[in-house]
């Protein structure tokens, strides 16, 4: 141990869990190694990790309640794209293993694109089951956005295997479904399962709009994802509509 350099100590600590690294560095510190700053760093990491675990446990409160009532497969459901002027609405349903936490999960709107992309892969990998449904702008114009959203959610749920026996939703109640439903206001911030669904829906939709950007570059879909930004409205007034615009949403911007 006496010949270890600080770089070697850092490399060894990086191989360990945060708690193991603290124990390793504490042992070195007690034998005279100057690792105070490195030890402080790992204590800060531990505090950050503990706060994150506490946040995630709070986000499992609705799931724990459902488990206590005897439900086994609890699905979180959410959508992306109710408000944009163009493109589809996308819904996702996710059943996670009971008690599972995934660090960083939150309402998709509170995450960066890179965070969402990373979590998208991790959620799909760790979920017991998930479903994703895309409902296009033509159907939205035909039945209105609320009904299109409900159809997307119902279709996403129908893809689950095993089937959910309890559904947590972000402030929506679905029609003609006998499964227990728990609508939660601001559910994507309060339920881990709904937050996971919000990430799957958001990433799926964002990727689609990026593809549309290559097809219709004059509108800037990759930047605003179809929402009514000044850039988007200006492009509509200049170039008119393209096939993915929602006619029922853009009446105020076209003559």
UniProtKB/Swiss-Prot annotation:
Claim: Nuclease is one of the keywords in the record: yes
Top EC category: hydrolase
Cited HAMAP family: RNase_HII_B (MF_00052_B)
InterPro entries attached to this UniProt entry: RNase_HII, RNase_HII/HIII, RNase_HII/HIII_dom, RNaseH-like_sf, RNaseH_sf
Entry EC no(s): 3.1.26.4
Required cofactor(s): Mn(2+); Mg(2+)
Location in or out of the cell: Cytoplasm
Similarity comment: family membership: Belongs to the RNase HII family.
Annotated catalysed reactions: Endonucleolytic cleavage to 5'-phosphomonoester
Source organism (scientific name): Ruminiclostridium cellulolyticum (strain ATCC 35319 / DSM 5812 / JCM 6584 / H10)
UniProt-recorded name of the protein: Ribonuclease HII
Lineage: Bacteria, Bacillati, Bacillota, Clostridia, Eubacteriales
Function: Endonuclease that specifically degrades the RNA of RNA-DNA hybrids.
Family annotation (CDD domains): RNase_HII_bacteria_HII_like
Molecular function GO labels: manganese ion binding; RNA binding; RNA-DNA hybrid ribonuclease activity
């Amino acid at each position: 141990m006496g010949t270890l350099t600080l770089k070697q100590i850092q490399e060894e600590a990086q191989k360990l869990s945060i708690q193991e690294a603290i124990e390793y560095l504490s042992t070195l510190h007690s034998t005279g190694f100057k690792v105070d700053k490195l030890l402080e760093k790992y204590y800060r990491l531990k505090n950050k990790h503990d706060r994150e675990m506490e946040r995630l446990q709070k986000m499992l409160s609705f799931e724990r309640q459902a488990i206590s009532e005897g439900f086994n497969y609890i699905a979180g459901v959410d959508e992306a794209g109710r408000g944009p002027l163009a493109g589809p609405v996308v819904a996702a349903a996710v059943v996670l293993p009971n008690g599972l936490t995934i660090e960083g999960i939150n309402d998709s709107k509170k995450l960066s694109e890179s965070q969402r992309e990373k979590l998208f892969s991790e959620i799909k990998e760790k979920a017991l089951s998930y479903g994703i449904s895309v409902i296009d702008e033509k159907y939205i114009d035909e039945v209105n956005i609320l009904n299109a959203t409900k159809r997307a959610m119902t279709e996403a749920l129908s893809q689950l295997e095993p089937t959910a026996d309890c559904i947590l939703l972000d402030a929506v109640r679905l029609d003609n479904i006998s499964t227990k439903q728990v609508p939660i206001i601001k559910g994507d911030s309060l339920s881990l399962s709904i937050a996971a669904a919000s990430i799957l829906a958001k990433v799926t939709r964002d990727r689609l709009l990026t593809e549309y950007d290559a097809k219709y570059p004059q509108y800037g879909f990759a930047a605003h994802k179809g929402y009514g930004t000044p850039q988007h409205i200006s492009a509509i007034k200049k170039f008119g509509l393209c096939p993915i615009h929602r006619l029922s949403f853009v009446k105020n911007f076209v003559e």
